[in-house]
């Protein structure tokens, strides 16, 4: 199994152990990994958005996969005891090789806060609000 797939399986297990449902959502031009535990739709929801992950392998070399090796936001979401919790990965994180091939490295480097990225994460947040 490739490292990115191993990291995805590990993240899914972490989420499931906390009663969260792992899914991949289409948002804008991206596929976004999420983990959600929502017991009451009227409750406020605690939202954790992952950081940049492994954007760079060295100071001058871009990573081929931005999936974090230690997912801090996911770890916090899993430990949160609130009944409604959502974890949102950044674009291009936790994708298999085929989907990752469609994700340009600029989205985890120079364009990580571009309109396309912000729009995609906003779409996921909007879906959570419904």
Which residues make up each language-model segment?
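Short, surface-exposed "cap/lid" segments of acyl-processing enzymes
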Residues: 31, 37-98
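Generic structural signal for short, flexible, solvent-exposed coil/loop and linker residues
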Residues: 14, 21-25, 65, 74-77, ...
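Alpha/beta-hydrolase active-site loop
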Residues: 99-129
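N-terminal cap/lid segment of alpha/beta-hydrolase-fold proteins
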Residues: 8-39
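Generic detector of short, locally flexible boundary/turn motifs and exposed helical patches
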Residues: 9-15, 49-55, 100-106, 127
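Short secondary-structure boundary micro-motifs
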Residues: 6-9, 69-70
